[in-house]
Amino acid sequence: MQSSIPSVSVSVASPAMETPTKASPDSKSPNSVGAIPSSSPLASSTKASTSTPFVENCSNLLCDLASIVEDSPPTLTNTSLSPHSFSLSDMESSMSNWLNPFAFDNTMNSAPPLFTSTNMGSPNSLENSTNPLLSNCGSPNSFQNETFTGPSLNEFDADDKIQRQMKILHSVDTIDPSTVQNYPSADMSNPEVKLKTEEIITPMDTTCKPEPSAKKIKLSPSSEDSCSIPETLPFSAPKSRGSLSPSETPDFVAGPGGKPKKTAHNMIEKRYRTNLNDRICELRDAVPSLRAAAALRCGNSLDDEDLGGLTPARKLNKGTILAKATEYIRHLEAKNKELQKTNKQLSDRLAFYEDPSMAPPSNDTRAVNSVNVVSSSDYSVHQSSRPNLTQRAFTSPTLNTMGRTALNGMVGLGLFNYFGNDSSQSVYGLFALPPFLMSPFTGTVLFNMLKIGVVLLGLFYLLHDNSLFKGFKGEKKSKVSTRSSMSPSSILFRKTVFEKYCLLDHSTSTISLFFGLLIFTLKSAYGYLTHRLSALYTSSENWVYSEQQLAEVRNMEKLLDAQLMGGDAKVDRLRLLMVFASSFSLPPSSHTCALQAMYCQLIFSNTSVPSAIVSKCVAFFWNAAKKQHSKSSVHAELRELPECTANLIENSHADDVFSPNMVERLWVLAKCTRDSAQMSDSIISSLSDVLVLSPLEVLASWYAADLLDALLMESLSRKVEISEIEEIISLCPKNSSIIRHALLAKLVLFPENTADSLNEVLAAYKNTLDLCSQDKRKQSSVLKINLSKLFTLHSCLSLALQRLGYGDVSKRMYQEIFVPDSDADITPLSFIISWTALNTFAPICTSPKENDVVEKMAMYVRTAIGTLKIQDLKLSRKLINSCIDIGSRLQEDLGYVSSA
């Protein structure tokens, strides 16, 4: 009968946590929804030291980034590292305290019972007890508002019907602080109820002995009715361990006395076994390895069975079937994840190398070059379905220059041959023109005048870009939306911009390129002379550009940026030279001069031109950019440089910026390949970074990355000044990944400014996550986060919290660090952060899990020393010996722990 007593199975709190007997007036009621007391040891120990939001912001940042990274540790995505978060043991103890006011005393379910001498002297003293766990038998919420006079212990042996009703009222499923007040109380003190009594509790000692059991009496019908459940309370039969299907519900058969008689227990168990065996057979037929085992038993071959890398089962018992089913589920999950990764890689590759196809030739008699421009809205919406992209063709800004030039040459050659063919034939008959006009002298003069007129008209037509003849075109150009929602650094967008503003022919013949270079040179000379002549009559301070001139200047700047950022699919030195020649038609500005320096370096480096001459030319354009930037306020309407680019031009020299390694990376960028993302010394890949908008910003970010790597390696042998890291931060584009890395380096290298540096790091990542929340497609291109960078950030935040005095929280965060096994993404930043964190946490780590992270981090540091190829042998030996000492100390500590 002891098992029939209603109870609630909850975990019991520690002995030190006593349940309050009376709620204070100003305290929150334990029955209120969500009132979970912070009784966990971690929360109580860190409550005084975690008043600042540093810990919460750090843990939230790690969880947000881990949810984006593939194969991230589950400890970061499923749990919070906040000191106020509950672990499993903390949650059990807290839920135990929370449910104690609603639950029956645990002593009713355990033998021997534990009664304190202060609250109960004998079993008869239950009536005067104030323990809410014992006085709550009537209603789960009535222990604070009313005093319940409970029966003695030997009166708990009630009839089976009453016990079943009480079990429904106080089962685990029905105890809910939001709904428990709706249930009526089961009044156990009704005097009309006559219960049969029996001794059900084994006496523990002399202080707690049950009274002699009374005689068994039979319940009258009236007593049964008085103890029944009210009709408003929904009655549900107690659930058995195995769930029955609707067809397997036990049948009720009327007995001889009219009372319902249940089906025999053996029949019910037989139905359970039959149903379970059928389900196991279905599971066996669904798993390939189990089907293969069944086929082998029948003597069939396994040629038609696709095991998918799984081994067939040897047995077909129930345990093997369940084990093989679990193995097959995990195999399918791994295969599904691998397929998702492959699909993502293929889609990224397709998006990167996608090139808009050329439009079909027009039916117009004129030779028109048409190019397909992908609508920005269609690209943003239907990016995944490439074949269904809506394409619109628009005519090129200029006619076919090469064909027009060749046609003019042929006409001139024909005229030259016609007038130059001086035959000695006589003139017979009369002619409409006077004879003196046909004299040799007159013919020579007319021929020379015609040649001069043709040349002048051709030059005027080419240099003015057909601006005077636009009104005579019969067919209007289709308007193309200038606004685009695509990323400015998208390779497709850059190619579209280059095709829109470039005058180059797609032919690769030498003659076409030569004529194109000649035309660009003439236009550049004409624009340069026009600007100089205008400057003679108007001072530079009073020079005002018209809207048309500004539009032409901006279009040309877009052309330069697009070609240097991979917009020209057939880029080579000659095509770069033609666009470089056309850049001289632009008014001088700091942006144009800096781009001309980049063009000069790319065109003439690693050629037959001496490197000294190339360096002088590059330095000339770079110094011109500095001069133009110093007086940039004169032409405020021209393009304004970003802050990082302006700092790069002002505070650096051309020889330092355009190193051989930098020139190689710029060539890779211009050729629109992904090799720059695989370069060992490149922290960011500007090809897919949507926040790097121009080649000058790419140059600044790569130069800052080189300076940061050099500074981090020098920090091992000398003390770094804070002005050096501030200079690097000033060269980084806003919200780019390089500025976040520079802020992490500042946080690690300068312990005295930990609080300010941590605020800057959290603010930088918050701004980046806000940008990602606006457009989900930019997560991979803006964050550029992976497991290695997540490890670097995790270690840096743990180190910062340790320096700020959050010892317990930092150790808890440190033990959840996932150290990557691969050495492919090791950078100087990850090496310095892991080395500093290792020296900080190795002396204070005590638990086995913390020591495991320390050991893995020591191995990571040793791997980084070999990967980065540190030139100083003494420094390398010192670092390796320190890692070995830490490892040997851990082995001693582990032995001490095991012996203890």
From Swiss-Prot:
Gene Ontology molecular function terms on file: DNA-binding transcription activator activity; DNA-binding transcription activator activity, RNA polymerase II-specific; protein dimerization activity; RNA polymerase II cis-regulatory region sequence-specific DNA binding
Side of membrane Cytoplasmic, spans: 1-442, 531-900
Subcellular localization(s) per the UniProt record: Endoplasmic reticulum membrane
UniProtKB keywords: Activator, DNA-binding, Endoplasmic reticulum, Lipid metabolism, Membrane, Nucleus, Phosphoprotein, Steroid metabolism, Transcription, Transcription regulation, Transmembrane, Transmembrane helix
Expression induction or repression: Proteolytic processing to mature form is induced by low oxygen or sterols. The processed form binds to its own promoter to promote positive feedback regulation and ensure maximal activation.
Annotated Gene3D superfamilies: Helix-loop-helix DNA-binding domain
Membrane topology, record value: Multi-pass membrane protein
Compositionally biased residues, Polar residues: 21-32
PANTHER family assigned: TRANSCRIPTION FACTOR HMS1-RELATED
Protein name: Sterol regulatory element-binding protein 1
Gene this chain is encoded by: sre1
